[in-house]
């Protein structure tokens, strides 16, 4: 067994070091464990809790228990985790099509701007509470837009990056823990707040006024010319574009870092990916299959986030539990206010209610949470195709661009 299992005694505690391959294999096992548990839990399905969190958190707690009682410490090789993180954010860039943005018109740009401004409030509130609670201000940003507006993907990417830059222990684990909390809170809060706004202001809905849908002019069921299926060649094209974006992205990131200071490695890859996507759209010389792109994005995200959660150092969060909960409670209050603000800014109609409910979903968790909130309201009051399109586009990739820059900028200020 020598060479297969790296188990040694370090400072009187047995330490198990998992290789890169073993780390990936474990991530896949816990990912499918999460899928199995979620499949048999109506609550987890209702709140759209991602399988990586469902399977990874129990394992992280087990590791914390074994470490706390000095049974064994388990360490992980995160080399492939970093690569998968870069690949995922590159696919976000490859989704940034200007042609798609045109379908939503001014509403998309306005909603994007409003959500970008809200990032400043999320981080500002987090920093203020962190300082008041006597912890490092950087935890305020980790429990701010990194984990709230950013979700598990951004938390898993920025957490280790910021922890390495600042040298503050527990930063990465705090970001993941806050993002996991936000996934649940975003779904539990969104639809009830939207329902409350509708009833409080007697907002006309499509159920009672079918003409609202006719006036909308957007058909969410309108199929594009692209097949929902993909072949091996389409998949290889996407993988090639991701690889090219990663390579050229290192040069872009280096150039930007020389001007703006240290930036996450994926920024350059996202920018190059967006350039490739729009070159493809406007020239037609190359094609990017959306289904293949989604597949690469989902696989890289699922394994990357599962690896990040598996390696959570929960023991480092014991002293941060109360301050983190205070910050997260404040974020829930603020995002509720934000939903009401969106209602007043966007014509005070049914679309604006749906935008608010969606904003709670991806403002605390992720885009799937936002869509679940909107589906919940739609099942009772009718659909809002325009809001669905706007939230999908802003939450899925647009907000990631501005969030990344604002996180980096505000982190430097503290």
PLM region descriptions:
Residues 83, 97-127, 180, 239-243, ...:
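Entry/N-cap segments of selected transmembrane alpha helices
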Residues 37-53, 70, 74, 192, ...:
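Flexible hinge motifs at transmembrane-helix junctions and intramembrane kinks/re-entrant loops
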Residues 125, 129-174, 181, 193, ...:
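Alpha-helical membrane segments and immediately flanking helix-loop junctions
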Residues 1-24, 33, 195-239, 281-286:
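Intrinsically disordered, low-complexity non-transmembrane regions of multi-pass membrane transporters
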Residues 128-135, 179-220, 341-350, 395-414:
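Juxtamembrane and boundary regions of transmembrane helices in multi-pass small-molecule transporters
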Residues 15-29, 75-89, 138-145, 260-272, ...:
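Structural signature of hydrophobic alpha-helical transmembrane segments
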């Amino acid at each position: 067994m020598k060479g297969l299992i790296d188990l040694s005694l370090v400072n009187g505690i047995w330490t198990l070091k998992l290789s890169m391959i073993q780390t990936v294999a474990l991530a896949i096992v816990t990912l499918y464990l999460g899928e199995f548990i979620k499949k048999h839990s109506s609550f987890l399905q209702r709140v759209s809790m991602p399988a990586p969190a469902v399977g990874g958190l129990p394992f992280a707690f087990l590791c914390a228990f074994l470490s706390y009682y000095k049974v064994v410490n388990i360490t992980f090789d995160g080399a492939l985790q970093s690569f998968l993180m870069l690949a995922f954010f590159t696919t976000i860039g490859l989704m940034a099509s200007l042609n798609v943005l045109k379908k939503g018109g001014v509403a998309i740009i306005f909603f994007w701007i409003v959500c970008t401004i809200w990032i400043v409030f999320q981080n500002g509130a987090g920093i203020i509470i962190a300082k008041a609670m006597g912890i490092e201000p950087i935890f305020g940003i980790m429990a701010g837009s990194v984990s709230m507006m950013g979700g598990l993907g951004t938390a898993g990417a920025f957490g280790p990056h910021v922890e390495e830059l600042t040298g503050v222990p527990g930063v990465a684990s705090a970001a993941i823990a806050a993002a996991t909390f936000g996934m649940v809170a975003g779904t539990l809060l969104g639809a009830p707040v939207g329902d409350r706004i509708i009833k409080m202001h007697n907002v006309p809905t499509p159920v009672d006024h079918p003409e609202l849908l006719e006036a909308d002019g957007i058909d969410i069921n309108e199929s594009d010319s692209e097949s929902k299926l993909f072949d091996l060649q389409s998949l290889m094209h996407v993988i090639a574009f991701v690889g090219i974006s990663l390579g050229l992205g290192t040069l872009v990131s280096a150039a930007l870092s020389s001007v703006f200071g240290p930036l996450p490695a994926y920024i350059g890859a996202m920018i190059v990916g967006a350039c490739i996507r729009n070159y493809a759209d406007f020239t037609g010389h190359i094609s990017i299959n959306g289904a293949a792109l989604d597949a690469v994005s989902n696989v890289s995200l699922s394994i990357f986030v599962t690896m990040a959660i598996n390696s959570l150092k929960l023991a480092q969060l014991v002293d941060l539990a109360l301050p983190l909960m205070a910050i997260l409670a404040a974020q829930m209050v603020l995002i509720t206010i934000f939903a009401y603000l969106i209602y007043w800014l966007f014509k005070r109609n049914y679309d604006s209610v749906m935008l608010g409910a969606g904003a709670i979903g991806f403002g605390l968790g992720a885009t799937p949470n936002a869509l679940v909130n909107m589906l919940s309201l739609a099942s009772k009051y009718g659909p809002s195709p325009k809001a669905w399109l706007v939230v999908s586009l802003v939450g899925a990739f647009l907000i990631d661009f501005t969030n990344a820059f604002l996180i980096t900028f505000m982190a430097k200020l503290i």
